[in-house]
A protein has these predicted regions:
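Generic anion/oxyanion-binding catalytic loop in active/binding sites
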Residues: 26, 102, 106
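Short hydrophobic/aromatic beta-strand or adjacent loop that forms the aromatic wall/cage
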Residues: 109-116
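Conserved catalytic/acceptor-binding region of the Class I
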Residues: 1-60
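C-terminal beta-strand of the catalytic ATP-binding
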Residues: 46, 117-121
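C-terminal helical/coil "lid" or tail adjacent to the Rossmann-like core of SAM-dependent
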Residues: 44, 49-103
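Short acidic, glycine/proline-enriched loop segments that cap or flank alpha-helices
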Residues: 7-11, 79, 104-105
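Alpha-helical elements of Rossmann-like donor-binding domains used by nucleotide-donor carbohydrate transfer enzymes
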Residues: 7-11, 36, 66, 86, ...
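Residues at secondary-structure transition points
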Residues: 2-3, 32, 82, 86, ...
Length: 122
C-alpha cells in the first residue's frame, strides 16, 4: 500500500537525480492509497467493507543490496553495467541510517493494503 518502500524509492530516485537521471519515470511499483484502491474496487462493482494500510516493517535475510538487485532493476536500466555496483553501494549507504540497525540487520519499510470487498450478485 501507499508508503511501501518509500524510503528505498526515495534513495533510488535521489541517487539517479545526482547522476542527472529522472528516476520518477523508472518506478515500476504501484502502492495505492486507501482512497485510490477503494475507488478502483468500486468502479469494478465491489462494495468495500474494510480497507486499511498496515505498516509491516520486514526484516531482510541479507543486506539490502540483494533486495535492490532483485526488485529495483528498472531503476538501474539507464546505468551502464559497470556503474551499477557503485549505484547500489550509494543507495545502501543512504538507507543505512533508516533501515539498518546497530547489529547490521536490515528491515524493508513495507506497507500492506488489506481489504475486504464483496461483489453483489447480479
Amino acid at each position: 500500500g501507499h508508503g511501501c518502500v518509500a524510503t528505498v524509492k526515495r534513495a533510488l530516485i535521489d541517487a539517479l537525480r545526482r547522476r542527472g537521471i529522472d528516476g520518477d519515470g523508472l518506478n515500476p511499483w504501484y502502492f495505492p492509497t486507501v482512497e485510490d484502491y477503494s475507488a478502483r474496487l468500486a468502479r469494478r462493482g465491489f462494495a468495500v467493507r474494510y480497507i486499511a494500510l498496515i505498516p509491516r516493517p520486514t526484516p531482510l535475510p541479507t543486506e539490502i543490496n540483494g533486495w535492490l538487485e532483485t526488485f529495483a532493476q528498472s531503476f538501474m536500466a539507464p546505468l551502464a553495467d559497470n556503474d551499477r555496483a557503485g549505484f547500489i553501494d550509494e543507495v545502501c549507504e543512504t538507507l543505512r541510517p533508516d533501515l539498518c540497525d546497530s547489529h547490521g540487520n536490515w528491515t524493508a519499510d513495507y506497507v500492506r493494503i488489506r481489504f475486504a470487498a464483496d461483489k453483489p450478485r447480479a
